[in-house]
């Protein structure tokens, strides 16, 4: 069975606290992460990414979108989110 992980922008957002859903350290967090750059990072890491723009995180009122990562059964979700954050930092340099 194929593994699907969901990466919400708030997992990487520097303005969100850990208790509100950020999953990376503040040092690794991204200012205003976009689903398009998350999807690009996921693809560069080597997984398939599907963007859903019209979906809101259950804790958020606004629509922020999400990225569905397919085929990431060789790593934990935490490792995946950390790798995405690191790659977005490289993209923004």
Curated annotation (Swiss-Prot):
One of its GO terms (cellular component) is signal recognition particle. GO terms for molecular function: 7S RNA binding. GO terms for biological process: SRP-dependent cotranslational protein targeting to membrane, signal sequence recognition. It is found in: Cytoplasm. The keyword RNA-binding applies. Disulfide bonds: none annotated. Signal peptide: none annotated. It holds the Pfam family SRP19. The keyword Oxidoreductase does not apply. Involved in targeting and insertion of nascent membrane proteins into the cytoplasmic membrane. Binds directly to 7S RNA and mediates binding of the 54 kDa subunit of the SRP. HAMAP family: SRP19. This is Signal recognition particle 19 kDa protein. It comes from Haloquadratum walsbyi (strain DSM 16790 / HBSQ001). The gene is srp19.
């Amino acid at each position: 069975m194929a593994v699907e992980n969901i990466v919400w922008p708030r997992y990487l957002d520097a303005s969100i606290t850990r208790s509100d859903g950020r999953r990376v350290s503040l040092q690794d967090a991204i200012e205003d992460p976009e689903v398009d750059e998350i999807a690009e990072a996921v693809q560069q890491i080597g997984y398939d990414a599907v963007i859903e723009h019209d979906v809101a995180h259950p804790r958020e009122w606004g629509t922020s979108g999400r990225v569905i990562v397919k085929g990431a059964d060789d790593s934990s979700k935490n490792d995946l989110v950390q790798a995405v954050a690191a790659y977005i930092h490289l993209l923004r340099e």
